[in-house]
């Protein structure tokens, strides 16, 4: 269970020929579609987003560009150290004040525009993007990962008939 940050380790494990009795119970959710969905509701006035640094190390800062272009909202990828957060807030406020709506990367020591290309390639080989249920929100289109058919023999939800309910 997790986001783009934890999916590469699941993918890498499955790509390395685990034993037949190995199973995974996956519920990986995707951040950009969730942000897009929340903005589409039009119920909350937001001035910008501080984007998660660890997720962004995998997907890259470019993964959020379509959101700024579509919704005209500033976004800043920030790390988790106190100074990272403060600089991220400063960068976001500066964009708001200057009327800019783009994705900036405060967390340059860890996040690249393209993200972790190898991790993304592994995820693409192992997972399909599907609609997913989010606790307290409901189903968000194209916001989750499901194991591709070729990896279903490792899917614990199928092996052991485990039904997911909203957590």
Annotate the PLM regions.
Residues 8-16, 33, 37, 66, ...:
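Alpha-helical scaffold segments in soluble metabolic enzymes
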Residues 87-167:
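Internal helical hairpin/lid segments
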Residues 1, 9, 45, 158-165:
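Extended interaction regions within the primary functional domain
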Residues 25, 42-112:
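A conserved active-site cap/scaffold subdomain adjacent to cofactor or substrate pockets
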Residues 1, 31, 35, 50, ...:
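Weak global preference for isoleucine
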Residues 3-63:
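Phosphate/pyrophosphate-binding betaalpha-module
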